[in-house]
């Protein structure tokens, strides 16, 4: 079985995340795709604004109708800083005979050498990096044993930071965020300034 993983803060989840996941799923003919929300991303300190429970619930609401995708709470249960190596070790134990692919944006390639235990990580999973057609990534990754696969993607210029700012300014999230996640954000009053 071929299983893909897409990690991130998902604060909030948006169509850029989901289209990237779908592109990798289709191009690499994955059997499953697991979204892995981080408790705290190591290279983005203090970037998360909503609770782990809210981010998990938003993500589940966004993909619950799509049987190709599932959401794991492994990093949220672990808490603290979320290192990909810890999740890769966990998933390798869960799926010892399967092909595992960690999906990243091409913008992460120049930072990959900074990831914790990246050499071991390269033994546990292959990496799929998303690249926008016509905009090749010029970064050179020189990590022995690392298996990289390019995915031509429909990368969207959407950032969760921008979306949180839109909520603060009373602007719509329509066409940026899945409807069920928008409903959740509204019901929970997420990303609003404190009263």
From Swiss-Prot:
Its EC number is 2.7.7.18. Keywords: ATP-binding, NAD, Nucleotide-binding, Nucleotidyltransferase, Pyridine nucleotide biosynthesis, Transferase. GO terms for molecular function: ATP binding; nicotinate-nucleotide adenylyltransferase activity. InterPro entries: Cyt_trans-like (IPR004821), NadD/NMNAT (IPR005248), Rossmann-like_a/b/a_fold (IPR014729). SUPFAM superfamilies: Nucleotidylyl transferase (SSF52374). Pathway: Cofactor biosynthesis; NAD(+) biosynthesis; deamido-NAD(+) from nicotinate D-ribonucleotide: step 1/1. It catalyses: nicotinate beta-D-ribonucleotide + ATP + H(+) = deamido-NAD(+) + diphosphate. The keyword Nucleotide-binding applies. GO terms for biological process: NAD biosynthetic process. It comes from the Bacteria. Catalyzes the reversible adenylation of nicotinate mononucleotide (NaMN) to nicotinic acid adenine dinucleotide (NaAD). Belongs to the NadD family. This is Probable nicotinate-nucleotide adenylyltransferase. It comes from Opitutus terrae (strain DSM 11246 / JCM 15787 / PB90-1). The gene is nadD.
